[in-house]
A protein has these predicted regions:
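Terminal regions of secretory-pathway proteins
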Residues: 1-304, 315, 322-644
Length: 644
């Protein structure tokens, strides 16, 4: 490394801050010209997914971008190599520089039996691990063209194929229902995906959603916001050409400040007469007649099924709180909330690891990664040195496997088993749930309707009409591919190597692990087998013998859930912790199934034993009241020690 002084660091920091200020001036000009996202457009609803604490997101993005621009200044000034910029600059701290105020603040961690709401202080040595508004973890170094933040290029130095072209040529839109899993499985996959990750995207300092595709911007490239990384649409695109579209909106993720504060690469109510989530008229909602529902995640309104599963969890939380209150009448409302939440979190972990993951990953992968919960007793496997944060490749690629499982339409069934209605998954319009009886009818539909098969066939609703506006929408597959490039994800071949699989030497070898037609399409799209993106190849892989996923995605997903299990101080099976359940309580938690949650929180009278799998001889439909679908006994929570 060259000799970089504190003066050099200050100069780079000042330059980084100046660049951010110039971007803010551009944002003001764009607003003045009316070049902002139009309310009600597909771009508007895409942005609405990421609306959390807008001010906090903007501040984090500004601080992270300042550090990135300062790093780029150092790279340019000292002509650093990619290795020097990625590894050498990590030894230079922002502390005591002019941009020290962009460093994340560390807070003390109190001793408690309850999780924090933002995930902080789960790990007492590293309070930021797994925290909301924090960086994703990485298991492979990022692949940026400049070593810092410029999107990956092909191995010959040219651009990668358009993400839309990859989606259009390699992914079909055919109806291929699963022979095994239900819509409930696909719904749980999306529920988990949203619970585990939300990637913040860049917003303007004034709160505007940034516009990337517009005729005026195309004619005057100076007006293109630096955070824009639009997806190019080819002239011969069979769907978008009839609308004259040549550009698909895409904003880069915010640049999160590095937790170690060093220079370096980019890191990335009542409704229908039933208890339901409270409504909030201020939320972005497509329906003019019925407001959207408020939950901890604005994406819960993305479609009626997501709102449905959030509603089930609300009901279960309140059911637990009522029962705990009757057992412990002296508990305050705050203690009831915390204890019910603690128990609900344990239930969700148990359902995920005993019912969902075995279907997704198969028994061999479950065993290899030690994912299966114990049948009795405590676990003492907690690892304080394991970062349980969400892995970048999981959040931006493998965790999005569920998009291939989505049905175009959702079925509804009466209590007599008659299919009486069908609804399209509308953008941010869960108004269906305001109708009496719709909640139970949708639950029955999730249990009876098969999900789509996991493969390179994707619902037309997602591939061409995502957040449909004026006849056309966006393409979720193209956006997923673009997000992987935005985050510097290495190509598919590097992930195979990471997972212990043989590296592919040519496209012919690709044909042996996926559908031949898809492999040949990849060979026409990419110049080198090492160029192939992780997401489309991971989706196209042949599944493992007893699993839904193929080997590469199974590896990434399994590693993520291994970390979430072993690196979680509050894991429900842990013994010897302030948060530990008693052994009697733990045995009751082990009775929980998704079918039981549906039984306890709806008017559905009969459900198959395993809600994620279609009814079969080994998976019969049982009456919710006859005891075959086990029920927790909360008697062992009487006089439970609490923390105030």
């Amino acid at each position: 490394m060259p000799d970089i002084t504190s003066t050099d660091l200050d100069f780079a920091g000042q330059e980084g801050r100046s660049i951010v200020q110039r971007i803010e001036q551009l944002e003001a000009e764009l607003r003045g010209r009316g070049l902002v996202v139009k309310k009600g457009s597909a771009e508007y609803y895409l942005q609405a997914q990421f609306d959390g604490d807008r001010r906090k997101v903007w501040e984090l993005g500004r601080d992270g971008l300042t550090g990135v621009e300062a790093t780029l200044r150092l790279v340019k000034t000292f002509q650093l190599t990619s290795m020097q910029s990625q590894e050498g600059l990590r030894h230079f701290s922002l502390v005591n520089t002019v941009i020290a105020d962009t460093c994340p603040k560390r807070l003390p961690c109190p001793t408690t039996k309850y999780r924090t709401s933002d995930g902080s202080c789960n790990n007492l040595r590293h309070p930021e691990w797994g925290k909301a508004f924090h960086t994703y973890a990485r298991v492979l170094p990022p692949r940026y063209a400049d070593g810092i933040n410029e999107a990956r290029l092909s191995y010959d130095g040219g651009p990668l194929p358009s993400a839309r072209e990859v989606s259009q040529r390699a992914f079909a839109s055919e109806n291929r229902p699963s022979r095994k899993v239900t819509v409930a499985f696909a719904l749980w996959a999306q529920f988990l995906a949203y619970d585990l990750s939300l990637t913040g995207v860049t917003i303007a300092g004034n709160g505007d959603a940034i516009l990337c595709c517009h005729k005026e911007i195309k004619n005057n490239p100076r007006l293109l916001h630096p955070a824009c990384m639009p997806v190019h649409i080819l002239d011969d695109d069979p769907y978008f050409r009839k609308y004259g579209r040549s550009c698909m909106h895409f904003l880069r993720s915010i640049a999160a400040p590095r937790s170690d504060c060093t220079f370096g690469k980019l890191k990335w109510s009542i409704a229908g007469g039933e208890d339901m989530l409270p409504t909030n008229k201020s939320l972005p909602c497509a329906s003019k007649d019925a407001p959207c529902f408020a939950s901890g995640d604005k994406r819960s309104n993305q479609n009626a099924l997501l709102t449905l599963i959030h509603g089930v969890m609300l009901r279960e939380h309140n059911r637990l709180a009522d029962r705990l209150s009757s057992l412990n009448p002296g508990w305050s409302d705050e203690i009831l909330f915390r204890e019910a939440r603690r128990l609900l979190c344990a239930q969700l972990q148990h359902i995920t690891y005993t019912e969902f993951l075995p279907l997704l990953l198969g028994n061999k992968v479950m065993s290899s990664y030690g994912l299966s919960p114990k049948l009795s007793g405590y676990s003492f496997d907690y690892k304080a040195d394991l970062n349980a944060a969400v892995i970048n490749s999981f959040a931006t690629a493998a965790n999005r496997f569920g998009h291939t499982l989505v049905q175009d339409d959702i079925e509804m069934y009466s209590s007599q088993g008659a299919r009486h209605d069908e609804s399209t998954l509308q953008k941010f319009d869960p108004s269906l749930l305001h109708s009496k009886g719709s909640f139970d009818a949708l639950i029955r539909g999730t249990l009876r309707q098969p999900a789509q098969t996991f493969d390179s066939h994707v619902s037309n609703q997602l591939k061409n009409q995502l957040f449909n506006d004026s006849g056309y929408g966006l393409d979720i597959i193209a956006l997923n591919i673009q997000r992987g490039r935005d985050h510097g994800l290495p190509g598919y071949n590097e992930w195979r190597e990471y997972c212990g699989l043989p590296r592919l030497r040519n496209f012919k070898e690709l044909e042996s692990i996926m559908d031949t037609a898809v492999a040949r399409n990849f060979s026409r799209l990419y110049g080198n087998v090492d160029d192939v993106d992780l997401y489309p190849a991971g989706i196209a892989e042949n599944p493992l013998p007893d699993a839904i996923l193929g080997p590469t995605f199974a590896c990434i997903v399994a590693e993520q859930f291994r970390r979430l299990k072993l690196g979680d101080r509050f894991w429900y099976e842990n013994g010897g912790m302030e948060s530990s359940f008693s052994e009697a309580q733990l045995q009751e938690i082990r009775k929980v199934t998704l079918s039981r949650l549906f039984c306890d929180n709806t008017h559905v009278e009969a459900i198959q034993l395993v809600a994620f799998v279609k009814q079969a001889g080994w998976n019969p439909t049982e009456n919710c009241r006859d005891g075959k679908i086990q029920r927790m006994n909360l008697a062992s929570w009487k006089n439970e020690p609490v923390w105030t």
